[in-house]
Regions:
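Metallocofactor- and cofactor-centric catalytic cores in central/energy metabolism, strongly enriched
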Residues: 1-144
């Protein structure tokens, strides 16, 4: 049996780079790599993508995934990402979409530093993007 091959696409917002929030990337990029390695440890081949922020970056990532014949695209919202940048491109590909909804922060109990919210608001992008995928008739699965 053939092992799965995924295109692993992190979604991000360009605004954070534009205003100099490098500390977010410094934490999110290693977590992305941790997740990619976790897939690989389970025998899944992972084709990585740079963090995608704008339409052209999403288009380039999907084109690359298609060119190397991945079995599906796994998205991960590293932060809220405006869905108008990604949804049309994801809806147009023939590749199946799996939306991975997870964060590095396990819980938000009373002792949690409220700054963690800045690293865990991707769910808003998940809801936005999946709404547009559904409107476009693009099937997807959610893994949380």
């Amino acid at each position: 049996m053939k092992n799965a091959k995924i295109g692993f696409m992190p979604l991000y917002i360009k605004l954070y780079d534009d205003v100099g929030l490098a500390e977010l990337r410094e934490r999110l990029e290693p977590f992305y790599e941790t997740m990619a390695k976790g897939f690989e440890e389970k025998g899944i081949e992972v084709v990585r993508s740079p963090f995608c922020r704008i339409e052209s970056e999403f288009r380039d990532a999907v084109a690359r995934f298609e060119s190397v014949n991945v079995d599906c695209i796994v998205t991960w919202h590293a932060a809220y990402s405006p869905s108008l940048e990604s949804a049309k491109i994801l809806a147009e590909t023939d590749l199946p979409i799996i939306v991975m909804d997870t964060t590095e922060t396990y819980d938000f109990g009373p002792a949690q530093d409220s700054a963690e919210i800045n690293l865990c608001h991707g769910i808003h992008g998940v809801m936005d993007m999946t709404n547009l995928l559904m409107r476009a008739g693009k099937p997807y699965a959610i893994a949380a």
